[in-house]
Every structure is written in structure tokens, then in C-alpha cells.
């Protein structure tokens, strides 16, 4: 299906669903503005990372956006939803206006069908405070795709709720056309959760993405056929018509992430421990037996529902420096090595979308490349990260602190990595506050201070002012 056919599909899906619904649905909307007033080469890192590419990288900018959403109700067996967000940025050398979200979704019992560009969070990391998942974060804007998935976890029959599963399958389009026209996305995930009503639950999941198809200026056409889709789905090598690299390895660019987590849920304390890894090369082993076991994201998430002054925080450590060792070989003795996370030599944009890293944003987005290249050039990183939030009277706050060591770039097949003695240190910090305006109903103002200090993103400092109006109407 071409993306131009998605809009009629959205209209048909909404129209059909409207006829099946009872009245008293609600639609939420918002109108927002934000001013970034700063000094330095960029807007501070934390002011743009994990924001779905909503804001400009310029140190001084104005951002405007409006949203309309109708959410699916879990209590209904049949329901529909949709969302639209229009964003705009104005800076000294930049003016951009774009649809950040445009989607429709339908629900039939425990299954959802999503069509379009929808902001989503994939993985078992903390959805609000994390630095970002290893495979998917909230850093890039969503690409258009068609997805079918369960509506969250569903109980397995005859297990009395102690065993639950969730999963999904997506087909998407990289319509930024960076070096390859009509590049496609394949994504699927499956999770299992054990524990049910017990206070301790264990979850394990696996995610698989592949970039494939399209027409490359360097490698020519990469045909979109059912045979190739079968090879992509199962991670098999390419046929005789594929490039030599895809015949030796797997067809397309594949990345797998395994997630393992433990959750403790008490009345006044909710704790989650999570571990995520990446696999770029075969064989795929269980998360605790991979050759790059030193790499991944480890997180602790704590919720204190009854303690408003400090009711949530996250501590995370991430490393991508092991990369299974320096050697990338397929001689039957040594597998993997020089993994080159997010990098693929045949796909100029690598694992990014519209210049923004799709995975963890500390593997720097191509927008930071001074030479204008479209590749990810900093994928050897160690990150120490904290984020917490709370409420004092009517003022909400969120504090984020991050320290990173950036070692540069490792690509597959080089047999060597950059020197681990020479790296760029970076400290990033941000304090955000917000409060409702008493004299203007449904309106909230925000004030933040954000900054960077170090050699990776230079020294940046900004004061960020925002205002937001939110409303609801029923029908």
C-alpha cells in the first residue's frame, strides 16, 4: 500500500467506526507555544532529545503546535480513535511546518489496527522518564505505518491471569528518502509477563526491526516481493538478485532488542528493574548469553504514589562500547564483532528518521553532524542518567541530569575501534517547572532552564518559556 492511500483508509475507518458508537465520546485538543532563548551552538541536548523531533536545534527559536486526539476506550469491545498534531519551528535560519501526527485506529475486542503516523512507546523502559529505549525511543517523529497489535497485555486462557502476552506487527515507510527512495520498515514484537495479581511480575520481550526495499542511488533497486518479505520476516540471507553483502549476511538491515524486567507493585511503592540489549549480527542468543553482554541499558524506575514532593524517579546506565569485540567475521569460528550499532553501509540514514536517531538519542542524531552527512557518527557511548519529578503545592517539576562519555564511531568490518583513551565528556541538565494559571481556565505556563557543558555538544544554556491551553468537547 502506498502512503498516499493511507488518508482514504483513515477516513473509511473513522466513518465505519462512528456508526457503531454510542454518544458521549470526547475529543481533546490543545494549542501550545514555546520560546527557547539561549546561547551556544545548539539548543541544549535535553531540550530536544526524546521530544519526537518537535523542537528546533537552534539556540533561539519559537515552537508552535496544536493537537486533536480521540483516544480508544479500553472498556469498549469496539471503538475507534484518531489523532492530528501540526508542529512549527521558527529560528534564524529555519522555518519548518509539518504534521507530527496523523493517524486513525480501530479496536476489535483485544486487537488494535493503527494506520498513519502515531507517537508510541515501545520497550519496557520507563515511558515518562527514561533516556530512551535501545531500539525505540521518543527521539524521532513517528514514521507512517500500518500496525496490528494487541491492546496491551492480554491474559492467556486457563492461566487465571498469571500469564499474559502482547505482540504486534507493523509495515512502515521511511518517506524521508535519504539516499534510498521508498525504503521500508518491518517491525514485530512479542512479550510475555508472569505473575498476575502477585506483587512481583517478570516480563521478557523481543523486538525485531528491518529496513529493506527501495531504490538506492548506489546499489540500485532492492525489489519488494513476497519472497523478499519472507526473507525479511525470518532474517534470512538475500537471493541471487540481492547485493553481495545481503547474500552473505541477511537481506536488509536487521536489529534485534531483547528486554527483561522485574516489577514490584505495592500500594505505596512501585519499582521496576529493566534490562535491554541490541543484537546486530547472528547468532541471536538469550540476553544473558550474548557476546556483547557488556552493552545495553539497565534501569531502575521507582514510583511513590503517596509522596507528591518526589513521586517518581529513574536511574539508568547505558553502554555501547563493547560491540562484541573489534572483529566482524563469518568464517564459522568468530561470529559478530564490530557491531556498529544503528549503522548500515547500504542505508545512508542508518537507524534514523528525518535526521533523528530512532533508538537511544545519546547515540547522536545525524542532525549534529557538522559536515552534513546523514549517518550516525557517535555510537560508542557510556551514559549515566537520572530523572525525577514531583509536585510542590501547585507547581510540578521534573529534574534530569546526564553524564556521557562519547568515544566516536565503530562500523562493522573495520577490525579496530577508536581509541578508548580519547573521548568527549558531556554533562547535560534540565529543570522543568509548570503550573496552571488561576485566572485563565485550562491554561498552563512552564519555565525551564537547560544546559550542556562538555566537548560533545559544546557549552549551551537556555531559558525556555511555554504556554499551553487544553480542552475537551463531547459529541
Name each model feature, range by range.
Residues 121-221:
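Internal, well-ordered domain-core segments that constitute the primary functional module
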Residues 196, 200-263:
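A conserved mid-domain beta-alpha-beta active-site/ligand-binding segment of alpha/beta enzyme cores
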Residues 33-41, 86-92, 108-110, 117-123, ...:
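Transmembrane beta-strands of outer-membrane beta-barrel pores
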Residues 246-257, 265-475:
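Outer-membrane beta-barrel pore domains
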Residues 1-25, 468, 473-475:
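Bacterial Sec-dependent N-terminal signal peptides
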Residues 21-28, 69-81, 94, 107-111, ...:
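Short loop/turn motifs that connect adjacent beta-strands in outer-membrane beta-barrel proteins
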Residues 20-120, 127, 136, 142-154, ...:
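Beta-barrel outer-membrane channel/assembly domains of diderm bacteria
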Residues 41-48, 93-97, 125-132, 176-185, ...:
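Outer-membrane beta-barrel translocator domains and adjoining extracellular loop/strand segments
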Amino acid at each position: 500500500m502506498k502512503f498516499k492511500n493511507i488518508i482514504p483508509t483513515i477516513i473509511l475507518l473513522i466513518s465505519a467506526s462512528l456508526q457503531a458508537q454510542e454518544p458521549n465520546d470526547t475529543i481533546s485538543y490543545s494549542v501550545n507555544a514555546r520560546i527557547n532563548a539561549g546561547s551556544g551552538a545548539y539548543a541544549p541536548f535535553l531540550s530536544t532529545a526524546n521530544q519526537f523531533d518537535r523542537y528546533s536545534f537552534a539556540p533561539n527559536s519559537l515552537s508552535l503546535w496544536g493537537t486533536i486526539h480521540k483516544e480508544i476506550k479500553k472498556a469498549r469491545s469496539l471503538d475507534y480513535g484518531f489523532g492530528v498534531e501540526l508542529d512549527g519551528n521558527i529560528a534564524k535560519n529555519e522555518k519548518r511546518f509539518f504534521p507530527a501526527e496523523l493517524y486513525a485506529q480501530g479496536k476489535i475486542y483485544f486487537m488494535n489496527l493503527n494506520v498513519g503516523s502515531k507517537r508510541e512507546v515501545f520497550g519496557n523502559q520507563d515511558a515518562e522518564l527514561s533516556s530512551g529505549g535501545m531500539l525505540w525511543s521518543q527521539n524521532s517523529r513517528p514514521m507512517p505505518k500500518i500496525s496490528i497489535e494487541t491492546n496491551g497485555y492480554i491474559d492467556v486462557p486457563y492461566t487465571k491471569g498469571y500469564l499474559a502476552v502482547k505482540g504486534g506487527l507493523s509495515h512502515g515507510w521511511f518517506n524521508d528518502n535519504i539516499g534510498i527512495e521508498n525504503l521500508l520498515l518491518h517491525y514485530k514484537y512479542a512479550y510475555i509477563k508472569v505473575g498476575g495479581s502477585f506483587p512481583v511480575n517478570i516480563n521478557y520481550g523481543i523486538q525485531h526491526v528491518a529496513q529493506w526495499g527501495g531504490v538506492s542511488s548506489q546499489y540500485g533497486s532492492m525489489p519488494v516481493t513476497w519472497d523478499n518479505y519472507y526473507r525479511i520476516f525470518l532474517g534470512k540471507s538475500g537471493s541471487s538478485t540481492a547485493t553481495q553483502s545481503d547474500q552473505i549476511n541477511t537481506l536488509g538491515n536487521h536489529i534485534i532488542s531483547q528486554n527483561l524486567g522485574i516489577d514490584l507493585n505495592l500500594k505505596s511503592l512501585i519499582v521496576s528493574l529493566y534490562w535491554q540489549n541490541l543484537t546486530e549480527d547472528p547468532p541471536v542468543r538469550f540476553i544473558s548469553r550474548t557476546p556483547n553482554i557488556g552493552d545495553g541499558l539497565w534501569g531502575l524506575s521507582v514510583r511513590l504514589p503517596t509522596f507528591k514532593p518526589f513521586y517518581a524517579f529513574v536511574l539508568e546506565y547505558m553502554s555501547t562500547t563493547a560491540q562484541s569485540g573489534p572483529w566482524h567475521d563469518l568464517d564459522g569460528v568468530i561470529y559478530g564483532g564490530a557491531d556498529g550499532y544503528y549503522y548500515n553501509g547500504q542505508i545512508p540514514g542508518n537507524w534514523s528518521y528525518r535526521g533523528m536517531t530512532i533508538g537511544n538519542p545519546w547515540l547522536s542524531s545525524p542532525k549534529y553532524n557538522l559536515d552534513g552527512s546523514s549517518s550516525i557518527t557517535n555510537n560508542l557511548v557510556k551514559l549515566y542518567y537520572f530523572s525525577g519529578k514531583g509536585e510542590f503545592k501547585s507547581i510540578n517539576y521534573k529534574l534530569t541530569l546526564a553524564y556521557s562519555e562519547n568515544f566516536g564511531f565503530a562500523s562493522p568490518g573495520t577490525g579496530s575501534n577508536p581509541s578508548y583513551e580519547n573521548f568527549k565528556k558531556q554533562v547535560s541538565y534540565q529543570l522543568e517547572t509548570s503550573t496552571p494559571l488561576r485566572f485563565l481556565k485550562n491554561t498552563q505556563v512552564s519555565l525551564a532552564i537547560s544546559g550542556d557543558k562538555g566537548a560533545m555538544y559544546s557549552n549551551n544554556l537556555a531559558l525556555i518559556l511555554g504556554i499551553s491551553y487544553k480542552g475537551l468537547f463531547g459529541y
